[in-house]
């Protein structure tokens, strides 16, 4: 056995050396270098595309600086009321101070709640300098917390993330230490026990109203505190009271496995608070090895908390504390018996009247979602809202709400009619007052709510007839469903920025084949005040860069439109035939085909080698109707392949230069899983795949993402979706890439599919990247490997790389 292990290791090392030589043993001006030079050749060739308004204090005018040509720019002053525009070479010429004595855009105080999912890959590093453990949470698109585990005292945790992702750090009792938004350059946080100066706008919409900072555990009137000792809760009288320092036990049955703990949620009249009782469970730890640490010779072992599908989870119950009675009542969990939570945390919200508190119940398996209310006097629990689905409720993105305290109402997002829409509830009775938005289109994101005028502003998709249904448009509607108006016009994807007083908005719209147009419009009716800029891409086109081509074809059902793009090389010749390479990411949590204007360098550089690059969103992805989305339910192996293959074939019918005898595919993470799956289920169509950091068996991946789509308890759907289970059916040329330090997808997922391929006697290529995390194929080394591999097998099909072979 020892000899066999040695032989396999030698084969792997030999392969790694050979493929590295193949990848880099090229002249400095070879095809890959020439393709990558497109980045340099197209840089700085787009002008008048970026407008950053600096509003003057009266809120009726602003200025901006815009690039007009290489190394040239101009300053522009805009009178928002009249639409008059003045242009000059300096602020002084415009009669404005050189220093920015102006307020910044209101967009900065209306920062979107949802974490951006399309930011570039980067890293997050958390160093815990406190004497106790801290907890790290990702704040998802709707403001919900998702635990990424503890960081023990003195430890450091590093993980892969994306620019724009929002993270929350709490102490061991759950008290927030700070919210943090990840910049493209990465983020390093040191937990020192002090509250951070975080942006107050990065939080859920229901918490928009600012509060004065309070001492953790202390009641608003300062008379009482809650303290936890030996896993139990104590009520403490504070300084200045008649019984200063007196402690009264509230509970006595707390244990290490079933402790009472924070956070502590006081109501405003200081008569009641809520703490939590939690059922702790052993946390799964994933172990990875840093084979080549930068600070020592010997490898390092890294462990981190990581729940996987099917794991036992902690559970929390609210505990209602009465100051008058000095009592604690554990709230019955009859209406929330099996919550999905990775930490046992429950977010509590007290009503302004202090007579009840509310919290969410997300049933494990994600087929029931409730907002529950608890009476402060009796502890009785009632339903405010209940959603149910035979497939899944997308609790990350589609459980937005806004409490309307003055009228005791609640705005709520639901897909109950098959589309993501807003509903108005009577919060006191839990009854629907009316549907606010309706139609065969979706609410993508709520931007603001005006309680005084009883209207809501939101971005919608599919609301403009004839448009790509993924394009965002700004809309407004009254709470009672009347007065609906679409405020944007251009045929493209719209990004919105409001003026400080919210009477104007700047609309930036574009398409992949239409450069950005920036307009100033009135909030009242969307009327155009003036066009500010139209991006100039003349020099970009002179470089040879070609506009992507949009294309729509019917999906598997022969009825539903599938939207995608095609990208050609600069040297494109319609008389030639080109192999087709698909970039795939079919994760059900979003849609991923680019919609707005960008140079799209990853795709264009790859096309430059002599490929036609295609991207499309098939059924099972998000941001269309519920029926479209539900295709993914317990069928992640489907990944929209029937729709995208039909789309590619339809495109080729009118494009004879697409050679469908040479089709490749690549993707990372969920896209890596799909890329390999192409050679398992669709190897009659796809011939080559590059699969990076794939979640090749969903039982090995993070719990929240996989149970959302495959459900709980685990059943045969997990086996159907597993590339490991079906590795023996793989045919074609496969390159597997993984970063040895991936903390997003357990790298063992890739190693296990390697093992399965070896056992099945399959030939394939495998490259682990050392000291690299998630998204290894997007590193310079990984990117080049991908380019070289696709070139070899699609442009030079008779050449074969060294392969890992196993019998």
Model-derived regions: residue spans:
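Serine-hydrolase catalytic core recognition
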Residues: 53, 347, 354, 360, ...
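Structured interaction patches on ligand/partner-binding surfaces of diverse proteins
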Residues: 172-197, 289, 296
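A flexible loop/linker signature enriched in serine peptidases of the S9 family
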Residues: 66-72, 223-234, 250-261, 276-316, ...
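Asparagine-centered strand-capping/turn motif at beta-strand->loop junctions
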Residues: 124-130
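Blade-terminus and WD-like Trp-Asp/Gly-His loop motifs, strongest in beta-propeller folds
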Residues: 54-60, 216-224, 263-272, 347-357, ...
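Predominantly five- to eight-bladed beta-propeller fold
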Residues: 81-102, 247-265, 275-333, 524-538, ...
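Short glycine-/Asp-/Thr-/Trp-enriched loop segments that recur within the blades
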Residues: 45-47, 98, 210, 254-261, ...
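Alpha/beta-hydrolase-fold serine-hydrolase catalytic core, especially in secreted/extracellular enzymes
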Residues: 45, 58, 70, 83, ...
């Amino acid at each position: 056995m020892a000899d066999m292990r040695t032989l396999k290791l030698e084969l792997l090392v030999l392969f790694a050396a050979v493929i590295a030589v193949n990848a880099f043993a090229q002249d400095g001006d070879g095809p890959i270098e020439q393709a990558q030079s497109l980045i340099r050749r197209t840089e700085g060739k787009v002008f008048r595309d970026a407008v950053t308004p600096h509003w003057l204090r009266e809120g009726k005018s602003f200025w901006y600086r815009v690039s007009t040509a290489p190394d040239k720019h101009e300053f522009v002053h805009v009178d928002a009321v009249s639409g008059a525009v003045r242009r000059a070479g300096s602020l002084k010429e415009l009669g404005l101070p050189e220093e920015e004595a102006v307020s910044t855009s209101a967009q900065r105080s209306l920062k979107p709640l949802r974490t951006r999912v399309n930011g570039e890959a980067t890293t997050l590093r958390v160093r815990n300098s406190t004497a106790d453990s801290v907890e790290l949470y990702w704040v998802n698109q709707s403001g919900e917390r998702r635990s990424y585990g503890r960081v023990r005292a003195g430890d450091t945790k590093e993980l892969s993330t994306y620019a724009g992702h929002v993270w929350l750090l709490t102490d061991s009792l759950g008290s927030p230490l700070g919210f943090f938004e990840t910049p493209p350059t990465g983020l390093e946080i040191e937990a020192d026990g002090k509250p951070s100066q975080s942006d107050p706008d990065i939080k859920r919409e229901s918490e928009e109203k600012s509060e004065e900072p309070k001492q953790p555990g202390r009641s608003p009137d300062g008379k009482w505190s809650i303290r936890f000792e030996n896993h139990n809760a104590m009520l403490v009288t504070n300084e200045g009271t008649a019984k200063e320092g007196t402690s009264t036990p509230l509970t006595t049955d707390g244990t290490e496995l079933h402790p009472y703990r924070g956070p502590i949620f006081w109501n405003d009249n200081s008569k009641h608070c809520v703490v939590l009782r939690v059922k702790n469970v052993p946390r799964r730890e994933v172990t990875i090895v840093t084979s080549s640490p930068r600070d020592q010779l010997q490898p390092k072992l890294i462990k981190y908390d990581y729940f996987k599908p099917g794991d036992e989870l902690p559970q929390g119950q609210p505990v209602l504390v009465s100051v008058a009675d000095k009592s604690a009542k554990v709230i019955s969990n009859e209406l929330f018996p099996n919550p999905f939570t990775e930490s046992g945390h429950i977010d509590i919200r007290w009503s302004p009247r202090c007579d009840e508190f509310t919290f969410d119940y997300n049933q494990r398996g994600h087929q029931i979602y409730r907002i529950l209310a608890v009476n402060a006097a009796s502890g009785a629990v009632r339903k405010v809202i209940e959603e149910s689905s035979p497939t899944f409720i997308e609790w990350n993105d589609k459980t937005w709400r806004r409490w309307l305290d003055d009228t005791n109402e609640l705005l709520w997002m639901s897909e109950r009619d098959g589309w993501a829409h807003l509903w108005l509830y009577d919060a006191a009775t839990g009854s629907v007052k009316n549907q606010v938005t309706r139609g065969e289109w979706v609410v993508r994101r709520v931007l603001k709510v005006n309680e005084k005028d009883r209207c809501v502003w939101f971005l919608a998709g599919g609301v403009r007839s004839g448009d790509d249904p993924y394009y965002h448009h700004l809309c407004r509607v009254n709470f009672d469903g009347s007065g609906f108006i679409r405020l944007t016009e251009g045929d493209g994807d719209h990004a919105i920025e409001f003026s400080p007083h919210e009477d104007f908005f700047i609309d930036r719209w574009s398409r992949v084949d239409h450069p950005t147009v920036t307009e100033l419009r009135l909030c009242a009716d969307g009327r155009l005040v003036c066009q500010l800029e139209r991006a100039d891409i003349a020099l970009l086109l002179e470089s040879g860069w070609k506009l992507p081509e949009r294309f729509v074809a019917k999906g598997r059902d022969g009825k539903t439109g599938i939207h995608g793009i095609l990208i050609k090389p600069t040297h494109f010749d319609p008389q030639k035939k080109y192999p087709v390479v698909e970039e795939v990411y079919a994760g059900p949590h979003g849609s991923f085909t680019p919609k707005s204007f960008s140079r799209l360098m990853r795709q264009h550089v790859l096309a430059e080698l002599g490929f036609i690059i295609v991207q499309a969103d098939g059924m099972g992805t998000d941001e269309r109707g519920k029926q479209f989305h539900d295709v993914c339910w317990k069928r992640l192996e489907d990944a929209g392949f029937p729709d995208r293959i039909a789309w590619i074939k339809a495109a080729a019918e009118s494009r004879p230069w697409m050679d469908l005898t040479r089709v490749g595919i690549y993707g990372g993470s969920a896209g890596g899983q799909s890329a390999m799956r192409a050679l398992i289920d669709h190897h009659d169509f796809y011939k080559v795949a590059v699969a990076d950091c794939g979640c090749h068996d969903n039982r090995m991946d993070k719990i929240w993402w996989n149970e959302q789509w495959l459900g709980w308890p685990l059943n045969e759907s997990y086996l159907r979706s597993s590339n490991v289970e079906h590795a023996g059916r793989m045919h074609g040329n496969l390159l597997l890439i993984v970063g040895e330090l991936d903390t997003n997808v357990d790298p063992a997922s890739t190693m296990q599919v390697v093992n399965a391929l070896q056992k099945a006697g399959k030939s394939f290529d495998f490259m682990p990247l050392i000291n690299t995390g998630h998204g290894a194929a997007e590193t310079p080394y990984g990117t080049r490997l991908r380019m070289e591999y696709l070139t070899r097998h699609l442009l030079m099909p008779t050449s074969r790389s060294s392969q890992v072979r196993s019998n």
